[in-house]
Amino acid sequence: MGLFPSLTQEIAIDLGTANTIITSNGRIVVDQPSIIAIDTRTEKLVAIGEEARKMHERTHDRIKTIRPLKDGVIADFRAAELMIRGMIKMIPKRRGSLFKPTLKMVIGILPT
């Protein structure tokens, strides 16, 4: 935690094969399935997390769902980036915060 905890927002992201969890100042603020849906014609993001999970194997031919992580490792970097960016946007804005969020990252190098 920073010098003025009420003015800062620290974010931690746990990328999991099944779910991605984002915490802000020690509290879970995002807990979503690790999946995205993209439009195959435009390559644009259509849905993230729970919304994308609901589309999995039930959508139009143009919509493809992707699970960016496999066996605990990033299998599709572009999809992982889209998912992370989208989930960061899901974080509720902290009232009174004067500074941009600080991202805390832990990278595991051993299988769990």
Where in the sequence are the language-model features?
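Nucleotide/phosphate-binding catalytic cleft detector across ATP-hydrolyzing
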Residues: 1-112
